[in-house]
Amino acid sequence: MKIDNILFDKLVVEAQSSPRRRMNFDLRTQADAPAGVGSSEWADQSQRMLNVLMTDTVIPIHRHTETSETVIVCRGKVREEFYDADGNKTAEFLLEAGGNCPGVQVPKGQYHKLVCLEDGSVIFEAKDRAYDPVGTEEFLKIVK
């Protein structure tokens, strides 16, 4: 499979029409376990995906307690922001395809969010574990 501008353009169209204003594309070759094999026994327990974002995409501050996350910008520009448990921004990284810093590694347990700065930005995301929806306790609730 080629990962090229044709694929990116197709995903941008899908993201534009999505209520969430983003679209992901699973890059795992074996997303589902074969019949008779439990998912915990299945070899590919990672997450590898493209995620296409619009500037009005909302990604709340959250964390992943069981895995780190790698984010690399393939097209466009985003800002990755790190937060402490009190909701204070502790760092931010401007990530730009072809720029000085196209990617960042988000440590396990680090509160963070991504802000899309260019419509149709395409990021590659990788996590160590199989997809598990972030529980409500993993979203940062800021009370001021």
Across the structure, where does each feature detected by a protein language model lie?
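A short, N-terminal "cap"/entry segment at the start of jelly-roll beta-barrel domains
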Residues: 1-45, 91-96
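Conserved short histidine dyad/triad with adjacent acidic residue
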Residues: 49-66
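Short, surface-exposed charged micro-motifs
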Residues: 50, 70, 113-114
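Short beta-strand His + acidic residue motifs that chelate non-heme Fe in jelly-roll/DSBH
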Residues: 60-62, 80-82, 103-106, 112-117, ...
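Glycine- and acidic-residue-biased ligand/ion/polar-headgroup-sensing regions
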Residues: 66-86
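Double-stranded beta-helix
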Residues: 87-94, 98, 111-144
